[in-house]
Amino acid sequence: MIKEPEFREYDPKKLEEKVEKFWSENEIYRKVKELRKDGPKYYFLDGPPYVSGAIHLGTAWNKIIKDMIIRFRTMQGYNVWRQPGYDMHGLPIEVKVEQALGLKTKKEIEEKIGVENFIKKCKEFALNNLKIMTEQFKMLGIWMDWDNPYMTIKNEYIESAWFTLKRAWEKGLLEKDKRVLHWCPRCETALAEHEVRGEYKLRKDPSIYVKFPVEGKENEYLLIWTTTPWTLPANLAVSAHPDYDYVKVKVEFNGREEYWILAKALVDKVLGEIGVKGEVVEEFKGRELEGLRYVHILMDEYPRQKEFKEKYEWAHRVILADFVTLEEGTGLVHTAPGHGEEDFEVGQKYGLPVYSPLDDQGKYTEGKWKGIYVKEADPKIIEHLREKGYLVKAGEIEHKYPHCWRCKTPLIFRATDQWFLKISKVKDKIIKENDEKVTWYPDWVKIRFDNGVRDSGDWVISRQRYWGIPLPIWQSEDGEIYVVGSWRELVELAVAIEVNGERIELPESYEEKLKVIEEKLGPEDLHRPYVDAFIIKVNGKDMRRVKDVVDVWFDSGIASWASLGYPRNKELFEKLWPADFIVEGEDQVTKWFYSQQAASIVAFDTVPYRRVAMHGYVLDEKGDKMSKSLGNIIRPEEVVERAGRDTFRFYMLWATNPWENLKFSWKGVEQVRRMLNILWNVYVLASTYMSLDNFDPRKLNPDELPFREEDKWILSRVNSLISEVENGIESFYLTKATRALYNFVVEDLSRWYVRLIRKRLWVEGEDPDKLAAYYTLWKVFDVLLRLLAPFTPYIAEEIYQNLIRPFTNVESVHMLDWPKVDEKAIDEELEREMEFIRRIVEAGSAARQRAKIKLRYPVRRIIIETEDETVKKAVERLNRILRDQLNAKEVKVGRVERELTIKPNFAKLGPEFKGDAKIIAKWINENGRELYEKGELTVEIDGKTFHLTREHIIVEEKLPDFFVSEEFEGGRVFVDKTLTRELIAEGLAREFVRRIQEMRKRLDLDVNDRIIVTIETTDENVELLKENLDYIMRETRADKIVFGKAKGYVVEWPEVQAKIGIEKVEE
């Protein structure tokens, strides 16, 4: 049976700890999964968070969304695959471990600690953070298979990556190439395009104008502009646009006459910046400059430039390129094929060498600045050019520049040999499959995704690092390669392993090989340096592994099948794949969402997921990013500690549309906490009265209960709510779901329905009217708790256990089915009518306040003026509710006669009728009523005809003194404020009832406790109160009311000129 609640006040911490203990002791999570094991499969793929540290509000928001979806689908009957994942390789972890070990370079890693120990430390770091993050996710009430997470470091996961790369190789989509790529000089590795997107940050760099002497022409120069002086040693050409107009300008510079060539459109801007005046002496198209040779300004400092000039026809000449713009610079672009993507492409067209005299740390390997880091060389190069007379102007520019997403070092463009997935060959396939098979939430993100695919280049997947999935590429000395697709294949092809520099031949038998491998290397581990030891033989050639590891974005990109253990475990893959739903943050549109589709098209020629949703970032209240430097970071634990898990969860799903950025607000958190407190208070009210009366819904036949209109209304509303919440979740418009729930709890249930039924709950005995209210409230909770369960699982469980479970025999609210709409219960007309009733009550209450009539004092009558038929029907059908809520003896639709004063509107008459305005005004003063009633008239005045409308008059109305009015959407409420003795006596009785009830509450009396009341007050009050003694006794559960000296627990109430005493009647 229903019991009185354990906590009368909502205490999230106590409640949630209690529920957590109940779940744990009763293995509810396991039972929920067991219950749905035969349901239709639903593959929810968890995008793996990176294990670089503790979770933040954004990570929490992501997991809360996921948990809500999983709980919702489970209640719908699905057997949900809910395996959490962790992204555990990559440079961010390497960087953290390097810092912990005091290492700064790859050389130090290899020489001071060794690759094997370094990888061991990375693994320890990753596993430790996994444990921390798992506990944090559990703290948020996230129900996933925490005992069986997928980890990108597991052998079977790595093998999935090898399988995918082998498929790419077999399809001709994996190849080695020399390209200009983003390079991190600190991490000493290449970065893929998608890793750099979003990593452009403001920084200051040099901004210099430099002149290149035209060969064979005295004092004639090509004028170029650059922000990367360090690339000038690698300059091999100057690019011009074939269709632009260029000019030769005569200038006076440093005391001598010179001729500068630049784009015509930029002359004024460039000369203005430099601070010189010029005269155009010649004009030509860009294509006419093609082949013009110049003298390399650092030929002596970088002797290989002499070799290039002799060997390559187009070295140190003007070449043509469409990428040249007039947005900035001079219209002539310094071109270094070893340091620019577009430079590389045009260089290939003209047969130029790819020259990049840098090592992996971004230091020069030759020439004047050998051994110096490029950014440190910038000022030295600028000063050197100044000394040589080639520097025209040096300044600074603040611009967005790409940085390493792992260590935040400024990147450089550098030509290197790398391994590529040829995404350019499958772009169209990705877009086609995506458009046909994937549903996006919101749908406009699909366009952004498609555009990102169109703009993407080939995927550089090799990284020159340690802690990652080893590239499964083995290469012979003569350059032939073989891609290994699995551990078994590697063992089968292996002929030897190398241990500490010693080659150990392997036997032919697979089983015998495994014994030797385990004896010499230990158990299977597909990481470096374990796999580096394997020497395989293909086509009669020994092959050793290419030392690179795979881009960490590839790890997560294969998650939809690698997490299922495919291809080692085909059964799960065949049952579940592709994923039914994924959801991640906005930055993943061109990252994880992209890497998955790219990898999946390579492996399976189709998409890896059916539905995908995007959410925004969490910012602070002002809209700023949370960061240590700003001191505005709020940790998830802090929110849970202050407000509770349910509040945190609901707030994150309620505060903003999921695809927008969430500006975290403590005020908003508190607002949600109040909503849950309101829900708790309604539960306390219901369970308190139901427990006293031993209420059992099973003993009642709802067909025989005398439901009132308000009961039918709330049952209709809660059934409408099912659709609102469900549609909100299905469309990923989560705020529609949460705000519908919020408004239902606060407005419909608490502020309206409970307000309407309070008196019915107070009645003693087996009253049918009270039982109808009980049954309605119980039924509402039965539906509402199931709707709330995915959002606020703790409070839903606690209320369910006491209010609903005694009559269902279902162990947990999370084991219930998602509610189905009872179409018979929905009455849309009643819902519309009740909405008008609430507006009328609000307007009527406002009118009473203006008249300074307290709600406890009844009024004689209220008149509703309206033209709206729905309002008229509502007032008739729900008249009892209006009378009760407005404390009025009579409420009816009608018209209140008032005195109208009609005056001319000179603001309109003057401009329109000018000199005739006065005679029209005189006519309005005499006949204005007719114009008001008809709306418009054509009248003849002094022989002239005028067309008049209501715009030409001002109407002032004067109500009878005993009326006060207020407008509402649909009409107007008129309250008769005349107070008779009878009304005053009734109001005074209510005033005393409220104070006695307050005293009962202060004494913490049970609702069934009887009392004796003594009242010490004025003679006038005594006479008035005697007229309603039965009412006072009934409402306060008093056995007797005595007028005289107050006794027992006494409180003085000056506002009613009384002292009241109450004493509990002892049984």
Swiss-Prot record:
Keywords: Aminoacyl-tRNA synthetase, ATP-binding, Cytoplasm, Ligase, Metal-binding, Nucleotide-binding, Protein biosynthesis, Zinc. Its EC number is 6.1.1.5. One of its GO terms (cellular component) is cytoplasm. Its main location: cytoplasm. It is an enzyme of class 6 (ligase). ATP binds at K628. Its cofactor is Zn(2+). Belongs to the class-I aminoacyl-tRNA synthetase family. IleS type 2 subfamily. Catalyzes the attachment of isoleucine to tRNA(Ile). As IleRS can inadvertently accommodate and process structurally similar amino acids such as valine, to avoid such errors it has two additional distinct tRNA(Ile)-dependent editing activities. One activity is designated as 'pretransfer' editing and involves the hydrolysis of activated Val-AMP. The other activity is designated 'posttransfer' editing and involves deacylation of mischarged Val-tRNA(Ile). IleRS has two distinct active sites: one for aminoacylation and one for editing. The misactivated valine is translocated from the active site to the editing site, which sterically excludes the correctly activated isoleucine. The single editing site contains two valyl binding pockets, one specific for each substrate (Val-AMP or Val-tRNA(Ile)). Monomer. This is Isoleucine--tRNA ligase. It comes from Pyrococcus abyssi (strain GE5 / Orsay). The gene is ileS.
